[in-house]
A protein has these predicted regions:
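A short, proline-enriched helix->beta-strand linker immediately N-terminal to the Walker B motif
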Residues: 84-89
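Hydrophobic anchor residue at the start of the ABC signature
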Residues: 80-81, 108
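Catalytic Walker B motif of ABC-type/P-loop ATPase nucleotide-binding domains
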Residues: 91-95
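Conserved ABC ATPase "signature" region
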Residues: 19, 35-55
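ABC ATPase nucleotide-binding domain "signature motif"
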Residues: 49, 55-78, 102
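Q-loop/switch helix immediately C-terminal to the Walker
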Residues: 5, 10-27, 39
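Helical segment within the ABC ATPase nucleotide-binding domain
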Residues: 105-120
Length: 187
């Protein structure tokens, strides 16, 4: 589980952070130090963090410029790496794009989509207001309203349901935004 707020040690480097997680989550009886280091290096490369491996994570509230720490997108990728180090079959992320600019958010979601595909892993994201470009990376969506499932399936299926319900949807409209606005207006 990757929470919305990054909980990282600011004085550790990226590599030290991932190695610390490896020491905690990978039993020494099954993994030698060299295997843990290899896993850390591989994960840093996969997450696009190899170039900042020796940089301190920093404190986002103190290091507002990235000279003393990582950018928001890099911090989020480190948080994801902390959870991926033990290779879980399912990864849950709460608002992984929160606080990121649109480019960094798209990069995170694209990376997660690639991981899901390449590693045959189930990745579940909660995102309150995903952009259309982010939605292109989703295989399936679960739309909830007041604790009830409104839709579970693809965007195409959601559009079909809306049209069947009598909605006239213009071609340039983001289907998910339309559905969310429709749900919110029917409160």
């Amino acid at each position: 589980y990757v929470p919305q707020s990054d909980a990282l040690f600011p004085l550790l480097t990226v590599k030290e952070t991932l190695l610390f997680s490896a020491h905690i989550r990978l039993p020494s009886s099954a993994f030698k130090l060299s295997e843990k280091l290899e896993r850390v290096e591989s994960l840093m490369a996969e997450l696009g963090l190899a170039h900042v491996g020796n940089r301190r994570v920093g404190n986002v509230h103190v290091d507002m410029d990235t000279r003393g720490g990582l950018s928001g997108g890099e911090r989020r990728r480190v948080s994801i790496g902390v959870e991926l180090i033990h290779d879980p079959p399912v990864l849950l992320l709460d608002e992984p794009t929160s606080g990121l600019d649109s480019s960094a958010a798209l990069k995170i979601v694209g990376m997660l989509h690639s991981m899901a595909k390449n590693r045959s892993r189930t990745i579940v994201l909660s995102i309150h207001q995903p952009s259309y470009r982010i939605m292109e990376h989703m295989n399936s969506i679960l739309l909830l309203a007041r604790g009830h499932v409104v839709h579970h399936g693809t965007l195409e299926q959601l559009q079909w349901k809306l049209v069947q319900a009598g909605h006239q949807i213009e071609p340039q409209v983001n289907i998910l935004e339309y559905a969310i606005e429709d749900i919110m207006s029917s409160k």
